[in-house]
């Protein structure tokens, strides 16, 4: 994969140069307070390296979906404040509804080596998501070097992820993207076998391409979560009122056939935990087999299924997981997700990669994050990467 061999911040001289860094500061805010700092922590190594090498560091990011207008509640001001505390030095916030207006120009003109400026939310400008040249040029006018360290938006061709870099002398990746390419890339390109992929989450339709692609590569494919019921239906089981994409049942049959032809061990639920309504206090009932009673919905994997999944995980040398096994937000239906996370965390001689999104949230929430080889910072991006797609934000960077 040519995407794996990209120049990094360590391959270029940054001293005294203005460096525009696209970070992923799309963090959850409550009353102006950041409630989850994972993404800020992820950005620190790159920022600290650039400061230590005497670069003039200009940070940019989007936050939420302001849809091309200035929305005070989506300002990056709280991020500048928190970053200042984390770095132990002032991060100057260029409050500027135009992102690259007078304030931003003033803040970036008088920078000394090692200074840090954070620009306002790039999606305040409607041009951002359309990758329009005028905004890309404005962003580029502030700097000499472009660094992309936002894996979470690497699958988007926007001004701040792709466009701005085209007008600068050098385009490299930061540590975060470098790590993503190393672990996600290596896991898929050269896995130590047995290689097991675990897919969960609500929809088969979100993961059509990824199922197809992984069947070319894996030894075992585990399917759980809401998407499993479409496969169970394809096997002829009753699914009650469980999540079901009836128009994807044929596709599920094709994938089961493909797994057989490729010699891939496809693991599906053999029992589930069901309830008669969707709520945290719903009574969990374990089914005898994979059939769900009429008017009941499957909300988690059953004990026999979990035992099968865990056994396969324990025999693996590479495990990639994307999407929860059940409604892990409800304690009564979190056992499948918890058991998979624990089994992966207990592997000592294996590469374990969590593919962002809900599974990353689940693993961090359950306290297993630091036991994994790598927890990806990108949900959609990691899925597209696993599909073997070229990600625009990475393709645009200079090759080594």
UniProtKB/Swiss-Prot annotation:
Residues binding substrate, per UniProt: 24-26, 39, 62-65, 123, 156
InterPro entries in alphabetical order: Phosphoglycerate_kinase, Phosphoglycerate_kinase_CS, Phosphoglycerate_kinase_N, Phosphoglycerate_kinase_sf
Lineage top rank: taxon: Bacteria
Catalysis performed (reactions): (2R)-3-phosphoglycerate + ATP = (2R)-3-phospho-glyceroyl phosphate + ADP
UniProt keyword annotations, A-Z: ATP-binding, Cytoplasm, Glycolysis, Kinase, Nucleotide-binding, Transferase
GO cellular component: cytosol
Assembly and binders: Monomer.
Name of this chain's protein: Phosphoglycerate kinase
Organism: Clostridioides difficile (strain 630)
């Amino acid at each position: 994969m040519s995407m794996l061999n990209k120049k990094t911040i360590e391959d270029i001289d940054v001293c005294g140069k203005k460096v525009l860094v696209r970070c992923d500061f799309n963090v959850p805010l409550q009353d102006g307070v950041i409630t989850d700092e994972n993404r800020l922590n992820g950005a620190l190594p790159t920022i600290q390296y650039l400061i230590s090498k005497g670069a003039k560091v200009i940070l940019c990011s989007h936050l939420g979906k302001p849809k091309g207008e200035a929305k005070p509640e989506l300002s990056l001001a709280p991020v500048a404040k928190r970053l200042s505390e984390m770095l132990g030095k002032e991060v100057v916030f260029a409050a500027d509804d135009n992102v690259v207006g007078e304030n931003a120009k003033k803040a970036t003109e008088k920078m000394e080596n090692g200074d840090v400026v954070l620009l306002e939310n790039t999606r305040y400008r409607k041009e951002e998501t359309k990758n329009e040249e005028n905004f890309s040029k404005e962003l580029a006018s502030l700097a000499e070097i472009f660094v992309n360290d936002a894996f979470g938006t690497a699958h988007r061709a926007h001004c701040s992820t792709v466009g701005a870099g085209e007008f600068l002398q050098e385009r490299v990746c930061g540590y975060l993207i470098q790590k993503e390419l190393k672990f996600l890339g290596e896991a898929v390109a050269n896995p130590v076998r047995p290689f097991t992929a675990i897919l969960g989450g609500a929809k088969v339709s979100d993961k059509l391409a990824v199922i197809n692609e992984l069947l070319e590569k894996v030894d075992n494919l585990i399917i759980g979560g809401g998407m499993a019921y479409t496969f169970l239906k394809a096997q002829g089981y009753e699914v009650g009122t469980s999540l079901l994409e009836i128009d994807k049942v044929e596709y599920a049959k094709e994938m089961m056939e493909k797994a057989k032809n490729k010699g891939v061990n496809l693991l599906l639920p053999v029992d589930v935990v069901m309830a008669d309504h969707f709520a945290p206090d719903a009574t969990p009932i374990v089914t005898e087999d994979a059939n769900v009673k009429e008017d009941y919905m499957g909300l988690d994997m059953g004990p026999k299924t979990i035992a099968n999944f865990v056994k396969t995980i324990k025999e693996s040398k590479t495990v990639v997981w994307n999407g929860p096994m059940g409604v892990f937000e409800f304690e009564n239906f979190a056992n499948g997700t918890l058991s998979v996370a624990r089994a992966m965390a207990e592997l000592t001689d294996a590469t374990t990669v969590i593919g962002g999104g809900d599974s990353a949230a689940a693993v961090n929430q359950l306290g297993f994050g630091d036991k994994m080889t790598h927890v990806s910072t990108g949900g959609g991006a990691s899925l597209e990467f696993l599909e073997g797609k070229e990600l625009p934000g990475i393709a645009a960077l200079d090759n080594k």
